[in-house]
Amino acid sequence: MRVTRFPLSTTRETPADAEIVSHQLMLRAGMIRRLSSGLYTWLPLGLRVLQKVERIVREEMNRAGALEVLMPAVQPAELWQESGRWEKYGPELLRIRDRHDREGCFGPTHEEVITDLFRREIRSYRQLPVNYYQIQTKFRDEIRPRFGVMRAREFLMKDAYSFHLDDDDLRAEYQRMHEAYCRIFQRTGLAFRPVEADTGAIGGSVSHEFMVLADSGEDAIAVCEASGYAANVELAPAVAPTEPRPAPQAERAEVATPGQRTIAEVAAYLGLPEARNLKTLLVEGADGGLVALLLRGDHELNELKAEKHPAVKAPLTFAEAERVERQLGCPFGSLGPVGLTGVTLIADHAAAHLADFACGANREGYHLTGVNWGRDLPEPETADLREVTAGDPSPDGEGTLTLRRGIEVGHIFQLGTTYSEAMGASVLDEQGQERTVTMGCYGIGVSRVVAAAIEQNHDDRGICWPAPIAPFQVALVAIKAEDPAVAEAAEALYADLTASGIDVLYDDRDARPGVKFADMELIGIPHRVVVSPRAIQEGSVEYKGRQDADPTHVPRAEIVTWLKNRLT
């Protein structure tokens, strides 16, 4: 492809509204252009990358035995009402009405549609298992679209759905999909980790996220390098202390702490480490009362864990200060469990292991020190309520945890019968009896993979594409193209490279060398070959890898073979 026929829409300035590197570089490289909030047009350069990711996904899904279909983007409300998700899904579901006043929605996902297709088409256990997939545009009405295509309202997704007679067969297919996903992300050239994850709004019992590792990642993941354990911090269990709780050494005392509001302030004022301070968080209870969640001062509440506790109202709702002061007669900033009546107390395992700790005294400007369980207040109900921290024991008992940042690009679920029961998806088994099928679903954010690849692979000059998904394999640059000898040599090399099946972008513009080099580095083509008057005299060309420090001179007669060896 010639640049004169493939206009580059590169810019030198970083757009002011682009917050993360991938958004900045996709705009600067001319890969995408914003149409409206969360809506983007993919330009030819960006589309080439998107299509390469899509091709890898399609090849591996086909290899794993999945069958490609294409379902409508607009879905009737009746299916969502039948599954029970019409009201549950929330405002991210863009609801519409047609001219006949029929309700529908733009699909953010397709569990209902595929389950409806299955119950119409598949009748016998002999037709199982079956796994359908599609690569299609989705729409989720994000309240604050940001980060370019990383969190857009419209995006390209591969979603697959499998149907099985029993859970054993589902688990086998789930493992096949897990392996297929690993091959997909290996082929894209990305560093990634599969991690245990929460099932969220999709539902089901077991799920894994596939995380591209990047410092800018929105998600925190807990990893044990010794054992290979990995989980989203939302799900990672915090191991309870195993050693005996220390015996009390101090007497309880009430201490004035004027103006000290935060854990850090109180700890510094009292001369105690934050780990020996107890924080009390009041939330709405499932029975309409209040629940006090008690954590060590240096630990953070894991809201997902708290929300799953049967005593806690879902979704998790923190108590309003007005209600606390009215019902308990004490200010928000001085709460503590001692003498707190009419409130259910639930302590994190680590908090229940404290001795001689400090906590709020339930009156303004005062805290208690030397507090001990069993002496100053009853032994609490305990639960895992906190987020894991670096250095915690790994839940699998091998080694310790480190925390990494990741970008979710894939998510797979064992759905079970969540949708098939609600929608009556069944088959006749070997005995001729109706049997509800069990399901799995498997998603990849295809457009999100592109942004994640940039977040992981860039420098101060631009994108450094992994070779399998680069828009072009080789950039051919002619220096002093107005020189007939240079033009002739560059044209001949372009023809040779193209004939050899190499995907090449030939910069035949009448532009300064610095402009050409800067553009090729910005758009991230992995290999650059330069034809210049000096190189012609030497019978060579100049080669430079995108991340090489210095160029290499390669004989002209050998460059095609030399490149092909590096591309395989």
Swiss-Prot record:
SUPFAM superfamilies given in the database record: Class II aaRS ABD-related, Class II aaRS and biotin synthetases, YbaK/ProRS associated domain
PROSITE patterns assigned: AA_TRNA_LIGASE_II
Enzyme Commission number(s): 6.1.1.15
Subcellular location field: Cytoplasm
Domain of life assignment: Bacteria
Membership in a protein family: Belongs to the class-II aminoacyl-tRNA synthetase family. ProS type 1 subfamily.
PANTHER family: MITOCHONDRIAL RIBOSOME PROTEIN L39/PROLYL-TRNA LIGASE FAMILY MEMBER (PTHR42753), PROLINE--TRNA LIGASE (PTHR42753:SF2)
Subunit structure: Homodimer.
Function (record text): Catalyzes the attachment of proline to tRNA(Pro) in a two-step reaction: proline is first activated by ATP to form Pro-AMP and then transferred to the acceptor end of tRNA(Pro). As ProRS can inadvertently accommodate and process non-cognate amino acids such as alanine and cysteine, to avoid such errors it has two additional distinct editing activities against alanine. One activity is designated as 'pretransfer' editing and involves the tRNA(Pro)-independent hydrolysis of activated Ala-AMP.
Name of the featured protein: Proline--tRNA ligase
Lineage of the organism: Bacteria, Pseudomonadati, Pseudomonadota, Gammaproteobacteria, Chromatiales
